[in-house]
Amino acid sequence: MTLEKILREKKKDKDILLMTHIVLGYPSFAANREVIEQMVKNGVDCIEMQIPFSEPMADGPVILKANQESLARGTRVAQCFDFAREMTRKHQIPFLFMTYYNIVFKYGEERFFQDAKEAGIKGLIVPDLPPEMGEDYFAYAEQYQLAPIIIYAPTSTPERMKTLAGSATGFIYCAARRGVTGNNSALDENFDNYLSNCRAATTLPLAVGFGIKSKADVQALIGKADMAVIGSQTIRLVDENGPKAVGPFVASLR
């Protein structure tokens, strides 16, 4: 079943879906394993697993630090594929890879898609690769039936959104704020108008992330988006209180 179909099926029984984010190898793969267990047990619908990169341009300080520390501890792309294979076999929810194009390019584009497919991954988020620059990438995404997730930003024009939607499957990731992940700024006054533009540009489900960290944030998206994305906040929790803090937090979000 495609990622879009899985999410639409899940949405039938819920006001809004939850997607969470982990950085692979941070603070360790053992901790990742425990965190994912907590997330799944407490109702997360989809998990994006970030393959660490030294210069994650879309990520704020929390996720940047996690990327750098994971790399410093020796995390390799092959380990990330092995871990993904283990998780997709154990847990019956969709898993995505998130990373940057340099990782995909160095690994070999077709090989990356082949191995991701074999590992049970349902989609890919590569925020620094616009469709105009990724002809082969998007062709492989179609060939191997992995959803290439496209990101909309508050600065995206309606025309640009429609153009981007032509390359997307799975869902659209709508950045709630300008800047990087984990930002504390309030939602723009024009946020509802922005989401209306997102909805008008595509028939795909909409996920909203960047700075979503509380039940109030999630509740505010009901009726406007299909999925809320929580990233930096769960990493902060693990840093402060360990993996076991993630379960109660996720359970409190809806």
Curated annotation (Swiss-Prot):
The active site is at residues 48, 59. Gene3D superfamilies: Aldolase class I. One of its GO terms (molecular function) is tryptophan synthase activity. Keywords: Amino-acid biosynthesis, Aromatic amino acid biosynthesis, Lyase, Tryptophan biosynthesis. It catalyses: (1S,2R)-1-C-(indol-3-yl)glycerol 3-phosphate + L-serine = D-glyceraldehyde 3-phosphate + L-tryptophan + H2O. Pathway: Amino-acid biosynthesis; L-tryptophan biosynthesis; L-tryptophan from chorismate: step 5/5. Its EC number is 4.2.1.20. It comes from the Bacteria. GO terms for cellular component: cytosol. InterPro entries: Aldolase_TIM, RibuloseP-bd_barrel, Trp_synthase_alpha_AS, Trp_synthase_suA. PANTHER family: TRYPTOPHAN SYNTHASE ALPHA CHAIN, CHLOROPLASTIC (PTHR43406:SF1), TRYPTOPHAN SYNTHASE, ALPHA CHAIN (PTHR43406). Tetramer of two alpha and two beta chains. Belongs to the TrpA family. The alpha subunit is responsible for the aldol cleavage of indoleglycerol phosphate to indole and glyceraldehyde 3-phosphate. This is Tryptophan synthase alpha chain. It comes from Desulfotalea psychrophila (strain LSv54 / DSM 12343).
